[in-house]
Amino acid sequence: MNAVLITGGTSGLGYEAARRVASGRNRVVVITGRDLDRVERTAERMRAETGGDVRGRALDLGSLAEVRRFAAAHRDEGLPLDAVACNAGVQVVRGLTYTRDGYETTFAVNHLAHFALVDLLLPMMAGGGRIVFVSSGTHDPAQHTGVPAPRYTSAAELARPPEDHSPKEGRRRYATSKLCNVLTAYELARRHPELRVNAFDPGLMPGTGLARDYPPLMRWAWRRVLPVLTLVPALGVRTPQRSGAALAELLVSPRFADTTGRYFTGLRPTRSSEQSYDRKIARELWEGSAELTAPQTG
């Protein structure tokens, strides 16, 4: 059997998507997480729930060396990939932090690590293979999400931004990383027409880990208030179960076998932000990201 790889598969959206795919019992499901014990326990629980072949693998997206190690191990395993979901993400709003590679954490984990991972795994993709980049409505100022509008400058500057430790800029860096996800999805679709590459907005989901860096009151609202709002579909608040089912559909359903270069809100194809269609920016991001993720020599 071929495999479906889902980064960040131990909880929330990634867990629910992996569980849905595993329930089909016709593909190996590989989930990743930073903590090996946790991801292996999650895989064991998912195998018991679904009867599917679920495998847990450690992957620290905060280290490009770890991304390369993971990709090499997967290639050595010889397991062809039907689909990859670039799902794992962080949102650092308190202060300015950096990865082991010296890159700003939100940009490095949400964009650069997945850019490198996909590039390294391309030789393992089956014909017509699918790649889904999990983005967010925060990338689009026209959606008025309350998050500061993304500010794309260059890949190099996003990796090493000016020193601004304010929560506002932390949220802006998150929105910008989600814009980069959409730009990358579109550029990858253009460069590899043999693949099916799309971006996905799961909606605002309570119960996920993205609010872990927020102040206590906001974390409380995330856990207690937002779940109630899922009862009002017009507000765009969705449960991880609902969005996970949609992501699983994009990854494996025959319905989307020929769909590429699109942006989905749930299962509905929609327009992304105006800036996300700027091919000049997409090329600069691609080329800059390739430089930033190349192995360092000397």
Place the predicted regions along the sequence by residue.
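Rossmann-fold NAD(P)H-dependent dehydrogenase/reductase core
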Residues: 1-209, 295-296
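C-terminal helix-and-tail extensions that cap enzymatic domains
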Residues: 4, 19, 255-298
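Alpha-helical packing segments of well-folded alpha/beta enzyme cores
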Residues: 42, 180, 184, 243-246, ...
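Active-site-adjacent bridging/hinge elements
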Residues: 85-90, 221-222, 262-265
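Alpha-helical membrane-targeting segments
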Residues: 162-171, 204-242
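C-terminal helical subdomain
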Residues: 177, 226-269, 279
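C-terminal/domain-terminus segments
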Residues: 191, 199-201, 205, 210-211, ...
